[in-house]
Amino acid sequence: MEIYKKSEKKNDMPDDSVPYLMFGRTRDEVVQRVSEDIMIASAFSPTHGVMHASNVSLCDVWRRTYSDDSRHVIRSFCEMMNTVVGSMPGGEPPFRLAFENLWWPGLRLSDESDYRLLESNLEFEDWCICLDTGHLMNLLPDIYTEKDGVDALLDIFYGYSRDLVERIRAIHFHYSASYGYRSTFEERSMDCDAVSFIGSAYPHVSMIDQHLPFSEPRCVEILDVLEPDIVVHELPGNEKGPLEDFVKQRTLIG
C-alpha cells in the first residue's frame, strides 16, 4: 500500500524515514516490518495490539476528498495482514490484533459495510475492532458540538448488528467536534519534501482530531450499547496537568 502516488516520487522519502513513516517501499518490506513489530510487541504479552486499518496518500492529507477507495484499502490491508499472520505459528498472531477506524480511506465504521469486507477477507481468527469515537466523529458532517457528536454516534451504534458489537472489544474514548475546521480549512498541495510535508501536517491533523474529554452525561450510553472489554481514555491533558482531562471524563462513568 502506497502512502503517496507515483507522480510524487520527486518528493521521495529518505531511506532512514521509510520504516517509521510508511513501513516500506515495497510489499515485501511492509510485510517484514509489520511482522517484526508484532513479534517485538509479543515479548510484553499485551492483551491486544492496535493497528489502523486505513491509508491516506500523502498528497491528500490537506484535502477534504481522497484519491484512495476505502474498499480497495481494506482489501489490500487484509491481504497484507493475511501474509503477515500466515507466517506465524499456527497461522495466528501471538496476541489479539485490534483494528482501529479512521476518517481516512479504509475502516471507517459509519455503517457495517467496511466491517463486513474486513470480516470476509481476513483469514485468521484472533482479531477484534478497536473503535475510536473521535475518529468516527471526524468522518461525519455537522459535528459542531459534543452533543452533536454523541447523538450522531448513538444513531450509528444502535444500527449495528449484534455480531459487530461483539467484535468491538476496545474503545478509544474521546470526542472531536471539528466540522467547523474541516469544512473551511484551506486545501494545500504537496509543495515540499515528504518529511517536511508530514511535519507541517501534524497541527492540521490535530485540529481535525481533537481528543477532547467528554462532559455530556449521555456519552455513557455509548459504552452501554457497545459493552467493550477495554476503555482507553485517549486524552492529552491540558494546561492544568496531564491527568485533568482523564479525571473529568472518568468521573462520568462511575
Question: Which positions does each model-derived feature cover?
Answer:
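Active-site-proximal loop/turn and secondary-structure-junction residues that shape catalytic pockets
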Residues: 1-3, 53-57, 101-105, 133-137, ...
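Active-site gating loops and adjacent loop-to-helix segments of metal-dependent hydrolytic enzymes
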Residues: 2-25, 191-202
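Extended interaction regions within the primary functional domain
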Residues: 5-16, 25, 65, 87-95, ...
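Residue-level signal for well-ordered alpha-helical segments
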Residues: 14, 18, 26, 95, ...
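Histidine-acidic metal/acid-base catalytic patches
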Residues: 31-47, 124-131, 137-254
